[in-house]
Amino acid sequence: GTKTHWRPDLEVFTDIKIENEYFEDVLKKQAVVNPNITFILRIQRENNSFEEKTFYYENGIADYVAEIAGEKPLTSVQFFTGDRKGRDREDKDDYKVKLSVAFTFSNQVKCLEYYHNSSFLEHGGSPEDAVKSAFTSQINAYLKSNNKYLKNEKPITFQDIEDCLVLVSSSFSTQTSYANQTKKAITNKFIKECMTEFLKHNLETVSYTHLRAHET
């Protein structure tokens, strides 16, 4: 493997005291989106001994969703993955996209996390828009087709759904458009469109027994 040693220049980095929790959070997120890879954090104490923590998710986001949901999720964890190719505009070149989504429902916890090219998207962007559109559309269609709505009842909204949804998505693309320089949201039109189609298709074909288990 590769070993990298780096010492910050104190003239540039005037404050180099970074809490251990920051490194733990970063490595955990990397383990989540890089399945079957072990990340080890070693923190040197004042007595020169080392405190060591290991981060590992054999099945990546699927195991992470199961961890968040705990022992009593309302449904089993669903995992979808696929590849797409397209472009954001007619005058642009095609690029490749790899999509992975894991989710379950819970009445104990809710969580929505989006990652792209191994980076956590704090503000979501295209993947978040796709999840909102696809889940609202498909669950609404299921409720209508099975006569689950009461007379004059308003259609379900994503706010209703997210209250019991535990979902993590991880996507990769050969071209990425970020909302701004902080890179906490992506704006690729094609990623939004293909991920919406990808989710709708998989939600439509997945066994509806999982959704029935969510009904109360």
Language-model features: where?
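GHKL (Bergerat-fold) ATPase N-terminal catalytic module, capturing the glycine-rich phosphate-binding loop
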Residues: G1-R7, F13
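Short, polar/charged loop or turn motifs at beta-strand boundaries
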Residues: L10-I16, F120-L121
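GHKL/Histidine-kinase-like ATPase module
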Residues: E21, K28-Q30, N36-K183
